Amino acid sequence: MEWIYPILGKQKCLPFYLSGIGIAEPEYHVIREEGLVSHQLHYTQSGRGNLVVGGATYPLEPGSMFYMAPGIPHEYYPLVEDEWTTCWLVFRGEHLLELMKGMGFDGFAYDKNVVNEKITGIFHQMLKAAKDPLYGDERCSMLVYEYIMNVRQAFLANKKYGGQSAKSMLQRALMFIHKNYARDITLEELAEMSGVTKQHFCRVFKEQMRMRPMEYLARQR
């Protein structure tokens, strides 16, 4: 377990500044009924957990990440106690809510398979810089911006290309449809074989194929 909360002073005039960073090993059950006062980026290093926000539950697995704006109630917890490790940072800045929204982070964002070596590398640079009481604040400010931009790029790339999990999920479903289109195929069957809920399957399928699963099936016939 390692965390740092820098003493906030002159860095408050910067557009981005670090208000806290750490590695939770293990991560515990956290309930924030009123959210945080800072912006938050949080990724899973190992183990598994769940995030609950806005009435929905999101799986937190290695490579997954979420962004949370200030003031949003949320909860997260490990699936197995003492076996979940996360890397988190919280940051602030004047007009940051508008800036984050302009970059596509509107309140809450989540995705799987977005954490890459660049993101983890910058995170550990920030963790090191945050320990420097003399020059760490400005260095961290630059790294926070670089970190956000790399996270944004990873989120956009995952959305564009679907992420490996979405690709493999659709590949299984499409192969099944092509082999069995002559018989009755249900949405429940496609979702079950893909290992996801009907709602998630439909959303990913429509995002990638630009049509609903049953519409695609009808066209194959």
Locate each region found by the language model.
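Generic protein-terminus/edge-of-domain signal
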Residues: 1-65, 80, 103-110
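A general structural signal marking secondary-structure boundaries and capping sites
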Residues: 11, 25-28, 48, 70, ...
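Residues that scaffold the ATP/ADP-binding catalytic core of kinase and kinase-like folds
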Residues: 52, 98-100, 204, 216
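Amphipathic alpha-helical segments enriched in hydrophobic/aromatic residues interleaved with Lys/Arg
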Residues: 98-164, 175
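N-terminal positioning helix adjacent to the helix-turn-helix/winged-helix DNA-binding module
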Residues: 115-118, 165-173, 209, 218-221
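Basic/polar phosphate-binding segments, predominantly the helix-turn-helix DNA-binding elements
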Residues: 151, 176-178, 183-221
